[in-house]
Design a protein with these regions (language model features):
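GST-like domain detector, emphasizing the conserved glutathione-binding G-site
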Residues: 1-135
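GST-like fold's C-terminal all-alpha helical module
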Residues: 102-182
């Protein structure tokens, strides 16, 4: 199995931290994303959505999307679970994971892609398009994430972890999202 990634990318960092927390080491290929490697063969055939990271299994099957990769690795290596042990833990972790992704991470992703000049022509992940960068998307993304963080802060008072009593994937995604917001 081989992980194709780009270290500086937010989604690549998510998988890297997950691997570190699980104590897993897998073969990794660092794609030259800034040079457009994800739009060239063999990567176009392997991953037609052109996003990193993606996991190439020994069978040749490709698993893309950071959370899907983490879920697959969790299933293959259930020790030190980061998606929860009980049904209740799994549900609470999933709840917070969805909240962080939908209300903070994705809005911030759009904010960055609509503000940073190097993303001109690439405002949607994995695409090259003529969609213009829109400053209103940057403003809305920051406002949305700020609202989420402001609403969440009081809920976390006195808690060590975002979901439940143990470190989880929700904490990884939450911490990386807060870091992205800075």
């Amino acid at each position: 199995m081989k992980l194709h990634t780009f270290g500086p990318a937010a989604n690549g960092r998510r998988v890297a931290v997950f691997l570190a927390e699980k104590g897993l080491e897998i073969e990794t290929s660092e794609l030259k994303v800034r040079e457009g490697a994800q739009f060239e063969e063999p990567f176009t055939t392997m991953n037609p959505f052109h996003c990193v990271p993606f996991l190439e299994l020994d069978s040749g099957q490709i698993i893309a999307e950071s959370i899907a990769i983490c879920r697959y690795l969790e299933a293959k290596h259930p020790e030190n679970p980061l998606f929860g042990r009980t049904d209740e833990e799994k549900a609470e972790i999933e709840m917070w994971l969805r909240r962080v992704e939908l209300d903070a991470f994705i809005p911030l992703l759009h904010a960055v892609r609509n503000a940073v000049p190097s993303f001109a022509g690439r405002v949607l992940p994995g695409t090259r398009s003529d969609l213009p960068q829109l400053s209103v998307m940057t403003t809305r993304g920051v406002e949305t994430a700020t609202l989420f963080l402001d609403r969440t802060e009081p809920l976390l008072a006195g808690k060590e972890f975002l979901a439940g009593d143990e470190f989880s994937i929700a904490d990884i995604i939450g911490a990386l999202t807060v870091n992205m917001a800075k």
